Swiss-Prot record:
Protein's name in the database: 4-hydroxybenzoate octaprenyltransferase
Keyword Protease assigned: no
Cofactor field: Mg(2+)
Enzyme class per UniProt: transferase
Function (record text): Catalyzes the prenylation of para-hydroxybenzoate (PHB) with an all-trans polyprenyl group. Mediates the second step in the final reaction sequence of ubiquinone-8 (UQ-8) biosynthesis, which is the condensation of the polyisoprenoid side chain with PHB, generating the first membrane-bound Q intermediate 3-octaprenyl-4-hydroxybenzoate.
Chemical reaction(s) catalysed: all-trans-octaprenyl diphosphate + 4-hydroxybenzoate = 4-hydroxy-3-(all-trans-octaprenyl)benzoate + diphosphate
Lineage: Bacteria, Pseudomonadati, Pseudomonadota, Betaproteobacteria, Burkholderiales
Species name: Cupriavidus necator (strain ATCC 17699 / DSM 428 / KCTC 22496 / NCIMB 10442 / H16 / Stanier 337) (Ralstonia eutropha)
Length: 285
């Protein structure tokens, strides 16, 4: 039993929290902005738990969808489903249970939030299949990873104002930036199996594309800060995030696999910088 639970934990990447953090930071930015400061703590924990559950469900669905491809990729061939340690139906069952628990969390919230939760689940569940035909699936990932933004505004304000969609667009650019660096790690394997990724699509302009996406992300988040009238700590946070992006350039410019992966992981700190600036800006108002 314990061995089975360990395999399920690996399936949903409990040992690799970076994905949850990249999903969580935009949600937290939005919660603070929507509430004008710290949100109600009950709502805060609903969104934190929902983020963890939906990211875990997404990992299970992703492994199920990619099970015939992952065996040809060095980094993924030892995943529990790919290695034959669990069955395909088990991965689907785990994903379904996690998604249902996540949806149960939003049942006490307003109708708009519940409808957006359904949309978010559809986007998360269909993302793995976009890698079959969409040249930049990372953009779709950005929608999936950023959907906590409109949901946060909906839960707190019972509306989704334009600034929320602006932030969602910013998150799309951020996701393309960090996940292109991630895709650079697997590019050779993805070319062999015919998988679509932004790293392949951008080709020799991959590094330039990543930096342009960071610039677009920062510009759109700056616009959001202006619309919300945020004070100087927010701008310090954005400046620190820009510094993180500059550091990522030093890691990815030589296209070394391990350094590209390090750049991907370091985006946790970029998201944290934006959150810290946001939280302090509201705290001193």
């Amino acid at each position: 039993m314990l061995e089975r639970l360990s395999l399920y934990a690996r399936l949903v990447r409990i040992d690799k929290p970076i994905g949850t953090l990249l999903l969580l930071w935009p949600t937290l930015w939005a919660m603070w902005m929507a509430a004008g400061g710290p949100p109600a703590w009950g709502l805060f924990w609903i969104f934190v738990a929902g983020t963890f559950l939906m990211r875990s469900a997404g990992c299970a669905i992703n492994d199920w969808a990619d099970r015939d491809f992952d065996k040809h990729v060095k980094r993924t061939r030892e995943r529990p489903l790919t290695a034959g340690k669990i069955a395909a139906w088990e991965a689907l069952a785990v994903a379904a249970v996690l998604a249902l628990v996540a949806f149960a969390l939003v049942l006490p919230l307003n109708a708009l939030t519940k409808w957006l939760a359904v949309v978010a689940a559809v986007v998360a569940g269909t993302y793995p299949f976009f890698k079959r035909f969409f040249a930049i699936p990372q953009a779709y990932l950005g929608i999936a990873f950023g959907f906590g933004i409109p949901m946060a505004f909906a839960a707190i304000q019972d509306q989704v104002p334009p600034v929320a969609w602006l932030m969602l667009l910013a998150n799309v650019f951020w996701a393309v930036a960090y996940d292109t660096a991630y895709a650079m790690v697997d590019r050779d394997d993805d070319l062999l199996i015919g998988m679509k990724t932004s790293a392949i699509t951008f080709g020799r302009f991959d590094v330039a594309a990543i930096m342009l996406c960071y610039a677009a992300f920062l510009a759109l988040m700056a616009w959001a800060g202006v619309l919300l009238g945020l004070g100087w700590p927010y701008w310090v946070g954005l400046a620190a995030a820009a510094g993180c992006a500059g550091y990522h350039y030093t890691l990815i410019r030589d296209r070394d696999r391990m350094r590209c992966f390090a750049a991907f992981r370091h985006n946790n700190w970029l998201g944290a910088c934006v959150f810290a600036g946001t939280a302090v800006a509201y705290a001193i108002r």
